[in-house]
Amino acid sequence: MNRFPARPLPTLPGALALLVIALLSACAGAVPSLPPSHLPVIASPTVAPSVTPSSVPVASIRPTASIVPVTAPIDELTTIAAAVPAPRDQRAISAAFHGGDIPYVARTMPLDVRIGATETFWVADVSNNVNYTVTAQLRYAGPVVLMYIDTTLDVPQHLIEQSAQVFEERIYPRNRLLFGEERIPGVDGDARLTILNTRIRGAGGYFSSADGVTRAVNRFSNEREMFVIDAVAFPPGSETYNATLAHEFQHMIHWHRQPRSPTWFNEGLSMLAEDLNGLGDNGAALAYLRNPDTQLTTWAPGSGVTRHYGAAQLFMRYLYEQYAGDSRPADWIDADAGNNVHVLANLAAYRRPDIVTFADLFADWAVANALNDPYVDDGRYAYRGIPTRAATMRLEPGTTSATVRQFGVDYMGPLDGPLAIDFDGADTVQLVGVLPAEGRFAWWSNRGDESVSTLTRHLDLRSVSRATLTFRLWHELERDYDYAFVTVSNDGGTHWQTLPGITTRADDPQGHNMGYGFTGVSGAPDVALGGVRGRWIDERIDLTPFVGQDVLLRFWVISDAAINGPGMLIDDIRVPEIGFADGAETDDGGWDAIGFVRTSGILPQRWVVRLLLFDSDETRVIIPEIDNQGRISLRVAAGQRAILLVSGATHFTTEPASYRVNLYQP
């Protein structure tokens, strides 16, 4: 979806939304007159770990390589990393599909507004996946912000002015200092931002990139730099309202500076914006720490979204406290650190050169979430922003088979010595939920937010009287927001015509379907992303209208912001009338691929494993080497207690990693 809500509402499937109000706990105290220069001090953990950390500083045992790739097609990771989708230019896409002279902006002069005047706005109903209009009155017009209030709501004027002034005088300059500037003057020709206060069905607030384009591009656009807040759930004048202002303004800035940033990174910085404005709370963080097997580097719809907010929030708190130094989050945004996580590893390496990969940085954060002891090693395993320690799970003697998410964490313990621990992790993991339909390879669309992947080739249909395109298709895309298309161009690629297939859809509830599009889950058209898994289906498209011509054929996958699925696979592509057949088995088959990549669907499974050892007088973090078959043997001596930490560490996939742990008396 193209909207960034402020916080999660766990009961909403398929969309980001606000946290249930009862879960929110506003930060104590008013907004400080001077913005804080660092994270607010958060209370020390109140829930003790199952083992007692030591106050004796002890260095961790750190070999030169903590993660060893196992036997699998390692080049797949390199190939995928090099296949970068293009950014989504909504205006250019609309022009390519629909033609016409599409303006970049709605106006070039500032809005002519007056207090008391009313305007009509589009609002998203996240629950029912529709858009509707409301009438709102301008109640405040300042140098930075225009505050509109739904005419059906009774909001005291002094509270409107209070929050408007907090935003203009404190949040606005603070966010711009930390995260950079928003788009000015933008689509509306006005440097002022619009904040619409209304009831929102299914969410508590959002920023939508659709509002930043003209209605010629998206008919639901409000043609303003703006965000929307549920003034019933978060009344103006409240701490939660002001926190939402800080949160959504970061999204607005971020979209302008780096629209392709993945949601986990973008949301993490919006949570950090709340913290750095003195408005943060720990509701989502606690949800994550209760369920730490949550993948940091992705974003899932449904009830689990609260944990994703918490993971992103805690990681950014840790990163900012430990490694920000003289850098600003704006620098991380400009470096596209969300898509290039080695940027974050390099940031950490300035202080600690032993951090080589993002997995090393992630592992230190994961240990800190279990330990939070500043006296162990050099202080890397602690930060003030953690409200309690991560939950652990007990292991019984014998062999336990389990799965863990990529960049999620299983904490196992306490484990009492004497004890032997044998770990055996899977060598490989699937890229998506299926393997190629035939042969060893298929074309994968890649995945990402605000991105466009294309696969294009020339087709000579001049010598035939009819033509048919057939192919095998698998997809898991965010329904009604992210679409795949099959198109033909007969003017060299300037304009493209979408083609109907067996499972394409022509309805367009969100203004994103360019004609005939594939969306949702293949084989389950009425199921939202995250419900059931897709399956391979047979597709057939009539090319007869283009016979007698030399044309270009193009597959597209276009995703908006906030949520994305595993993407699309295509295989066994044929136009039998001209003798064309391609199963992605050899080289590029004459295709021009942007974002798309040939894949076997199998990636090497990498691992992060740590053993936290607690003696009577010291705490140690053991970083074992993993052999080339993903195996480790560890020992806990008599009188020691331990926690075993296991994480998957393979990029690009959201499929879980399988492993076995065997506990026995040595």
Summary of predicted features, one role per range:
Residues 210, 214-222, 239, 243, ...:
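Acidic/His/Gly-enriched intrinsically disordered linker/tail segments
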Residues 487-550, 598-629:
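Exoplasmic/lumenal beta-rich domain surfaces
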Residues 53, 57-180, 184:
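N-terminal module-boundary/linker segments of secreted carbohydrate-active enzymes
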Residues 28-30:
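Bacterial signal peptide processing site
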